[in-house]
Amino acid sequence: MSKVGTGDSKNTLYCSFCGKSQHEVRKLIAGPTVFICDECVELCMDIIREENKSSLVKSRDGIPTPKEICKVLDDYVIGQGHAKKVLSVAVHNHYKRLNHQTKHNDVELAKSNILLIGPTGSGKTLLAQTLARILDVPFTMADATTLTEAGYVGEDVENIILKLLQSADYNVERAQRGIVYIDEIDKISRKSDNPSITRDVSGEGVQQALLKIMEGTVASVPPQGGRKHPQQEFLQVDTTNILFICGGAFSGLEKIISARGRTTSIGFAAQVLAPEDRRTGEIFRHVEPEDLLKYGLIPEFVGRLPVVATLEDLDEASLKKILTDPKNALVKQYQRLFEMENIELTFADEALGAVARKAIERKTGARGLRSILESILLETMFDLPGLEGVEEVVISREVVEGTARPLYIYADRADRASETSASA
């Protein structure tokens, strides 16, 4: 900071960057031994914005191929090959479309939002989370059951955009290229086929409210969240390029699809859809827009979800793989917990099969695996920190079935294995 002249001028402050005096600029901000004017701050902001834009363009050019996307999904999600293919192609095309828009204006490519239909615990949420991780874009999840129309008690649909903005650290440009996953979308279906005379604020009303942001609109988002009021300043977020993925278990939809199959008089559909012994996931593969309309989704909402990916029930082999194969597999997680006590945790192959069968019986899919393992290992995790000399814990099929206790193998004497026979 320099001071020029004499008299009054010796008390004049100057910008350390451009040299302008405090009288030539609107604001002069003081730092330790330096000053910066508002014009230099604006110039610095412009430079940063340009750098951010150029880095964004680089990421746009590096869109992973559908095969690359599918390969990474395989690391985290077991099975569901058909759903992975549909998602990989849809997401690749979505970001290719954004890249196309920055270079060409002759043909406008429409956005293709995605609907995931599958039984509970089949991997819908995990697929969406993994996609966001692959693409390194802002990602947020919303629960459709908490949403209501604007003005009613509950969460506004625009709060979804606020959450996305928060995950992008309030970088509007990054948020506008993000992914929104709306779970439990089947819970906002219309309560009956006929329009009701009473207001359905958490069903059809929410579908109507979601239409605009899914298609593309400029949403006014209150930065601090909560309800809007006139004195508030809003952030403007364009939702045109945000990819919406909706997921739901759609319990009962298989009956609608099967009923349609039985009414088919000719062709292959009657034989394909009618059998009662077909698994839910297999029946979902034959879903048509008319089935979703009968279920209670309004036509405009179904039209906003042109890509439909169906997930199948997980069989015993798939559930066993989920326990051991992914990078964040449950068995690996518990083994790491036991390693912290310097103890090795071992599961017999038959034990993993028994855990998988329990999950199938409970109809909870992969989501139920953790609770089953927690109940099996509860007593062991309670006792172990107070025991000395335990080197290994072995879980057998009998332990899972509740007819025996885990086998404790001690380091000092192999014959001191604590093996409790089947309880009566």
From Swiss-Prot:
An example Gene Ontology CC term for this record: HslUV protease complex
One family name in Pfam for this protein: ClpB_D2-small
Domain ClpX-type ZB: 3-56
Transmembrane segments: none
Domain of life according to the entry: Bacteria
Gene Ontology MF term list: ATP binding; ATP hydrolysis activity; ATP-dependent protein folding chaperone; protein dimerization activity; unfolded protein binding; zinc ion binding
Annotated GO biological process: cell division; proteolysis involved in protein catabolic process
Keywords (A to Z) from UniProt: ATP-binding, Chaperone, Metal-binding, Nucleotide-binding, Zinc
Residues involved in ATP binding: P119, T120, G121, S122, G123, K124, T125, L126
InterPro entries found in the cross-reference section: AAA+_ATPase, ATP-dep_Clp_protease_ClpX, ATPase_AAA_core, Clp_ATPase_C, Clp_protease_ATP-bd_su_ClpX, ClpX_bact, P-loop_NTPase, Znf_CppX_C4
Gene3D superfamilies, sorted: 1.10.8.60, ClpX chaperone, C4-type zinc finger domain, P-loop containing nucleotide triphosphate hydrolases
Residues that, per the record, bind Zn(2+): C15, C18, C37, C40
Role noted for this protein: ATP-dependent specificity component of the Clp protease. It directs the protease to specific substrates. Can perform chaperone functions in the absence of ClpP.
Subunit structure, as described in the record: Component of the ClpX-ClpP complex. Forms a hexameric ring that, in the presence of ATP, binds to fourteen ClpP subunits assembled into a disk-like structure with a central cavity, resembling the structure of eukaryotic proteasomes.
HAMAP family associated with the record: ClpX
Family: Belongs to the ClpX chaperone family.
Protein name from the UniProt record: ATP-dependent Clp protease ATP-binding subunit ClpX
Source organism phylogeny: Bacteria, Pseudomonadati, Pseudomonadota, Alphaproteobacteria, Hyphomicrobiales
